[in-house]
C-alpha cells in the first residue's frame, strides 16, 4: 500500500486504528490546528478539529479542543478560508 503524507492514523476511544486525511492545517490566534476527515467516511460533513501541540521540532501531538470559544474560533476561520476558495 502506498503511504501518503496527507494520511495519518489515530487511535479511537476503543484503541482501534483509524486513518484520517489531513484536509488543512491553519493558524488561529498564534496556535496551529489540523482539520481531519476519516478516510473511510462517505459523508462530506465528517471532519474533526485538533490542536497541534509541538513537543519539539520533529514531534507533535494532536489534542482535542476542550474550550468552546477556541473551537468556535477555529471553525469560523476554517469556514472563512473555505468560502474564499470557492
Curated annotation (Swiss-Prot):
Top-level taxon: Bacteria
Family named by the database record: Belongs to the UPF0473 family.
HAMAP family: UPF0473
Descriptive protein name: UPF0473 protein Clos_1662
Species lineage: Bacteria, Bacillati, Bacillota, Clostridia, Peptostreptococcales
